């Protein structure tokens, strides 16, 4: 550049600075330190618009123009200082530097990759990540020399291109033509102004901006003066500077190594900003309009966002919700003492290979502006945290993955492949969000404010009976730092495999892009926008989170390492994250309930309703109804009735206010391949593998119930704590018959172990005396038939809810018992099925298909007489019931409800005459089994009933004992009454149970009994009259049972005198018929066959007094084997011990 050009550039820049940066210069002049270096940041776009010639000179000669800018800036500062009338407190500063930023966005000036040789000498903007920082050094850039001959003093500048090396001139530069070549260095007399701060950093290309397989390149950056220590390892920075070359001084026979470096003029740190995402008012207005559209049903809008999250993975609704909450993040807080509480949540995905864990990690890394994706196999502690590297004779710190992901996301795949000493190094990084380094004499602390999303495989096959720490071989301190741990079990399931295969093949054959799916850029913009929200906790959300934390602390099966204050902090972070995801600035009750439901579904929760397999979760058809179910379940269990009533009223007002509520639901049902698209729409009602357990445990909040099945995994079970919604329960079962996964749990690869799978009722345990009553009431029809019936019933129909089981008033209930509300009846109905859930066995596939076909045919048959409910509060029965069960309606219920349908078997028997019909109900069946007709019930205790399995009896003995049949009725009645005369305190507090449920087996066994009645009817005479009298007493009792359902103690004492007799005694003795003064005292006559005292009768009753049944939250899906060896015992011996 010639002198004219230099003068032009200097004048234009001086006038520009005086006009646009006068205030900045005044602030600098007010500073007291005159030797410090002060920057003035100049926007290149504005400068070039003022004068285009400056832009041309700047691009052609950047080093010379920058020196001119600095000189012009000093002149401008001096002019401003002299123009002030009162310059008190202002002083002139000599070390002023013009810092250029804001270059025009064009490929010639802005680079995202490391510059190459052709860029040498150009002023560029380069974006990268700092991976290494050196120590700050003192650089002497000028040195004075004196000629030994003429004593001329001259200045020598250090050569940047040769690592700031000083070279003495070959001859004296004096004008006196001195030819001396000997000089003396005056370094001892050099002032501090001849030195400057110097630092070298190393930047690397951003990994997310590279293509797959590309190795990120790096380059050295030179920082001087005020730019020193302006960044640290792990920072994302944009550097404005001149690309230059440098090499070591030449040596003989040594090749010259030239490297490209960037001499920085200005550094802009991008940590706090969302790099590469343009956030303007138009984008914000688009998202505000989106939530305004879903104002009536915000959960439908949230599910649309979740469906766009990793759309190549089908379903997995729970995992997508958890990942979205983790990406949204919480709020970081710092108290008055300086203690910092992290706002980032950590998520661990544990699952079998091929369950989509790595897909979620890759997608999350793509939509997060600052992210690092690594694997545990190739990462050491230095690769994850920080390492000390010796370069050019000095030690430097090089940042690892966690430091590079500061204020971003760090995805670690194969997390269990880390070595043990490497895992411990990230403890501080996960909780304190910093890394303390003391390596090679370098002691410092680096920030790791990152969200960790890790994935791991279980150690071998996942064993639900063991803890998560044992299954994945990770220590408890490390696991406790994860806010959520989701388990993905790839269990055998034909329906799930069919849906997944059709979804994948559809995308392969006919790839299509759904219009409802958000693009990746839109998802990136949304998550960058919501991370700027600062939601605050509401009082309702505080109450729910606090109450849930207290219940976790009080839980018997709590993990002491997990249920600490970290759990409460995790709940707060996740609640704030969900509020951000819903685009709100307040954490409401909806957020708290959703967070509790997700926490319950993870392995970190389970205090309320247990864990769930997050793999088989689908998007709900009605998200608002699903939330209502969650709200009822959780708030009822947390004992917050006031919040529940207020929330239900709010939901009701919301539904009434929304006129177009059906439209968002219809849109949700059409949700894209990511949730319910293609063939998957036909399977929209499919549920998790634990849906069968959900149906039997949703009402009583059993610890063993699968919480995720009912409130989380879809619309298949909308059962609230106060009973199912009327009319919907039956319809949902009918719609989900084909695509339902209800039967999956029954055909799992492992049998059931009662210790881990038996649901525990919240009511007090039933005494053994109450168990004995079940023997008289529920007679088995044969071991083989009973087991087959139980298997078919468990696999072809869900366990009945409140309205599916008849609960008429019965004598035997304690005094003062009255019909309770639907919730109590529901609890009783469910608890009656507890023994059946213990007896789950393997079933052949053919048998399952047969029962499934029968259930489908029954659903299509409109001529079947419906089952009448006992009270208006009970819902309609599920049409999936077998026809035998529907027709087997108790007689008292028919009298109460005036039903028109009659049993065909009863009509055929009653045609033989009244005495014949009465006797037919108390005879031996064909297979010599102890049976009992449902119509004749004795006094039933409120205790929990247990089914009885008796050994078969050979036909000769049955024929031999057949003649003594009538004489045995009163003795059997006496034995039953004696068993009911146990102390009342043993059965107190136990909810009444529904009648015996195995009616399909009784129906099948009843037909052969008609032929066996005839030879025994001839024994009538006096005994026939006795049976007629007993029947009249029973009918009178039935009419009074609706008014009173109690059995007086005096009657129990009288009837307790009866005892069992051997077959020989029963032939010779004829016991007197029981006399009942009051029909309500004696109860209905119960005459049934008796076995010999010498024979042992086996039962599957669990000994509640010796072993307390508990359900482990880790055994909901992989069912261990049932060993019924300790369950067999001599019932007669037990009766003699407790008369």
Curated annotation (Swiss-Prot):
E.C. numbers: 3.6.4.12
Catalytic reaction annotation: ATP + H2O = ADP + phosphate + H(+)
Record-annotated MCM domain positions: 299-504
GO CC annotations, alphabetized: chromosome; MCM complex; MCM8-MCM9 complex; nucleus
Annotated SMART domains: AAA, MCM
Binding-site residues, ATP: 351-358
Keyword set includes tRNA-binding: no
KW Electron transport (keyword) present: no
Places the protein is found: Nucleus; Chromosome
Sequence ranges of Pro residues compositional bias: 863-880
Domain of life: Eukaryota
Record's function text: Component of the MCM8-MCM9 complex, a complex involved in the repair of double-stranded DNA breaks (DBSs) and DNA interstrand cross-links (ICLs) by homologous recombination (HR). Required for DNA resection by the MRE11-RAD50-NBN/NBS1 (MRN) complex by recruiting the MRN complex to the repair site and by promoting the complex nuclease activity. Probably by regulating the localization of the MRN complex, indirectly regulates the recruitment of downstream effector RAD51 to DNA damage sites including DBSs and ICLs.
Subunit annotation: Component of the MCM8-MCM9 complex, which forms a hexamer composed of MCM8 and MCM9. Interacts with the DNA mismatch repair (MMR) complex composed at least of MSH2, MSH3, MSH6, PMS1 and MLH1. Interacts with MLH1; the interaction recruits MLH1 to chromatin. Interacts with MSH2; the interaction recruits MCM9 to chromatin. Interacts with MSH6. Interacts with the MRN complex composed of MRE11, RAD50 and NBN/NBS1; the interaction recruits the MRN complex to DNA damage sites. Interacts with RAD51; the interaction recruits RAD51 to DNA damage sites.
Protein known as: DNA helicase MCM9
Source organism of the structure: Bos taurus
Gene name, Swiss-Prot/TrEMBL: MCM9
């Amino acid at each position: 550049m010639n002198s004219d050009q230099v003068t032009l550039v200097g004048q234009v820049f001086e006038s520009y600075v005086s006009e646009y940066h006068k205030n900045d210069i005044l602030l600098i002049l007010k500073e007291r330190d005159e030797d410090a270096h002060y920057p003035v940041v100049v926007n290149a776009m504005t400068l070039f618009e003022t004068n285009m010639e400056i832009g041309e000179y700047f691009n052609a000669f950047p080093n010379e123009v920058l020196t001119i800018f600095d000189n012009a800036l000093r002149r401008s500062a001096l002019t401003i200082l002299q123009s002030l009338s009162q310059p008190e407190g202002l002083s002139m500063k000599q070390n002023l530097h013009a810092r250029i930023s804001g270059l025009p966005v064009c490929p010639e000036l802005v680079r995202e990759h490391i510059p190459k040789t052709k860029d040498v000498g150009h002023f560029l903007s380069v974006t990268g990540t700092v991976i290494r920082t050196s120590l700050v050094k003192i650089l002497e850039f000028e040195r004075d020399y004196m000629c030994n001959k003429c004593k001329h003093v001259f200045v020598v500048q250090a050569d940047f291109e040769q690592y700031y090396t000083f070279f003495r001139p070959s001859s004296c530069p004096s004008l006196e033509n001195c030819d001396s070549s000997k000089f003396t260095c005056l370094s001892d007399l050099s002032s501090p102004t001849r030195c400057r701060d110097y630092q070298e950093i190393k930047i690397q290309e951003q990994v997310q901006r590279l293509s797959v397989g590309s190795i990120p390149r790096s380059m050295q950056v030179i920082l001087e003066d005020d730019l020193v220590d302006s960044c640290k390892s792990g920072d994302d920075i944009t550097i404005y500077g001149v690309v230059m070359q440098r090499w070591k001084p030449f040596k003989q026979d040594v090749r010259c190594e030239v490297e490209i470096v960037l001499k920085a003029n200005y550094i802009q740190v991008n940590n706090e900003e969302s790099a590469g995402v343009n956030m303007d008012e138009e984008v914000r207005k688009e998202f505000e309009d989106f939530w305004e559209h879903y104002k009536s049903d915000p959960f439908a809008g949230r599910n649309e966002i979740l469906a766009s999250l990793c759309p190549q993975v089908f379903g997995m609704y729970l995992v997508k919700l958890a990942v979205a909450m983790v990406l949204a993040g919480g709020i970081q807080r710092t108290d008055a003492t300086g203690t910092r509480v992290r706002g980032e949540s950590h998520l661990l995905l544990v699952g079998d290979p091929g369950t989509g864990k790595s897909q979620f990690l890759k997608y999350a890394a793509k939509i997060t502006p600052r992210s690092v994706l690594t694997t545990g196999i190739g990462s050491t502690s230095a690769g994850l945290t920080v390492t000390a590297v010796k370069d050019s004779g000095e030690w430097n710190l090089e940042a690892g993955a966690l430091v590079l992901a500061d204020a971003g996301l760090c995805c670690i795949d194969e997390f269990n492949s880390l070595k043990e000493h490497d895992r411990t190094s990230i403890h501080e990084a996960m909780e304190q969000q910093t890394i303390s380094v003391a390596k090679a004499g370098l002691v410092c602390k680096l920030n790791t404010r990152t969200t960790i999303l890790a994935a791991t495989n279980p150690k071998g096959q996942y064993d639900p009976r063991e803890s998560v720490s044992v299954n994945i071989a990770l220590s408890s301190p490390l696991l406790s730092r994860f806010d959520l741990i989701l388990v993905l079990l790839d269990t055998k399931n034909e329906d799930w495999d069919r849906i997944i295969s059709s979804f994948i093949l559809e995308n392969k054959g006919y790839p299509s892009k759904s219009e409802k799916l958000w693009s990746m850029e839109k998802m990136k913009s949304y998550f960058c926008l919501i991370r700027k929200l600062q939601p605050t906790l509401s009082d309702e959300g505080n109450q729910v989170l606090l109450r849930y934390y207290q219940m976790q602390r009080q839980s018997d099966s709590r993990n002491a390492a997990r249920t600490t204050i970290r759990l409460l902090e995790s709940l707060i972070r996740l609640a704030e994250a969900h509020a951000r995801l819903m685009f709100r600035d307040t954490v409401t009750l909806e957020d708290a309930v959703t967070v509790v439901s997700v926490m319950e579904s993870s392995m970190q929760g389970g205090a309320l309703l247990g864990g769930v397999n997050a793999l088989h979760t689908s998007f709900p058809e009605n998200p608002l109804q699903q939330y209502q179910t969650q709200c009822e379940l959780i708030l009822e269990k947390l004992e917050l009735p006031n919040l529940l009533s207020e929330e239900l009223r709010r939901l009701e007002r919301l539904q009434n206010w929304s006129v177009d509520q059906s439209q968002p639901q219809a849109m949700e049902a059409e949700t894209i391949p990511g949730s319910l698209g293609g063939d998957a729409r036909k399977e929209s009602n499919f549920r998790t593998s634990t849906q069968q357990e959900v149906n039997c445990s949703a009402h009583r909040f059993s610890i063993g119930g699968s919480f995720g099945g009912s409130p989380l995994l879809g619309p298949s079970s909308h059962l609230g704590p106060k009973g199912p919604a009327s009319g919907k329960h039956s319809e949902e079962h009918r719609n989900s018959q084909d695509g339902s996964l209800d039967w999956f749990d029954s055909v799992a690869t492992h049998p059931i172990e009662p210790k881990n799978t038996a649901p525990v009722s919240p009511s007090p345990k039933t005494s053994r005396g109450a168990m004995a009553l079940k023997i008289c009431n529920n007679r088995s029809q044969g071991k083989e038939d009973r087991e087959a019936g139980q298997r078919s019933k468990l696999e072809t129909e869900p366990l009945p809810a409140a309205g599916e089981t008849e609960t008429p008033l019965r004598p035997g209930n304690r005094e003062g018992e009255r019909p309770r509300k639907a919730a109590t009846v529901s609890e009783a109905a469910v608890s009656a099925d507890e023994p059946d859930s213990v007896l789950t066995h393997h079933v052949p596939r053919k048998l399952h298909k047969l029962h499934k076909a029968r259930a489908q045919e029954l659903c299509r048959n409109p001529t079947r007489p419906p089952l009448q409910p006992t009270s208006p509060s009970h819902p309609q029965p599920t049409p999936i019931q077998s026809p035998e069960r529907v027709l087997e309606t108790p007689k008292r219920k028919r009298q109460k409800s005036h039903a028109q349908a009659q049993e065909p078997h009863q009509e055929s028997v009653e045609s033989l005459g009244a005495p014949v019909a009465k006797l037919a109900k108390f005879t031996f069946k064909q297979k010599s089994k102890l049976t009992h007709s449902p119509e004749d019930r004795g006094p039933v205790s409120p205790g929990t009933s247990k089914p009885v399995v008796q050994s078969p009896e050979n036909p000769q003995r049955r024929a031999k004992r057949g003649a003594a049949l009538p004489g045995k009725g009163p003795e059997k009645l006496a034995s039953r009454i004696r068993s009911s005369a146990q102390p009342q305190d043993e059965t107190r507090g136990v909810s009444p149970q529904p009648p015996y449920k195995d009616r399909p087996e009784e129906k099948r066994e009843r037909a052969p009994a008609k032929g066996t009645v005839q030879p025994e009817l001839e024994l009538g005479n006096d005994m026939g009259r006795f049976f007629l009298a007993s029947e009249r007493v029973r009918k009178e009792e039935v009419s009074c049972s609706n008014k009173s359902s109690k059995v007086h103690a005096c009657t129990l004492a009288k009837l307790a005198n009866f005892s069992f007799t051997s077959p020989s005694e029963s032939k010779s003795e004829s016991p007197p018929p029981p006399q009942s003064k009051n029909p309500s005292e004696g109860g209905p006559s119960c005459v049934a066959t008796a076995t010999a005292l010498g024979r042992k009768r086996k039962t599957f009753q669990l000994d509640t007094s010796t072993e307390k049944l508990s359900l482990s939250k880790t055994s909901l899906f992989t069912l261990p084997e049932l060993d019924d060896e300790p369950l067999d015992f001599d019932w007669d011996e037990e009766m003699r011990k407790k008369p």
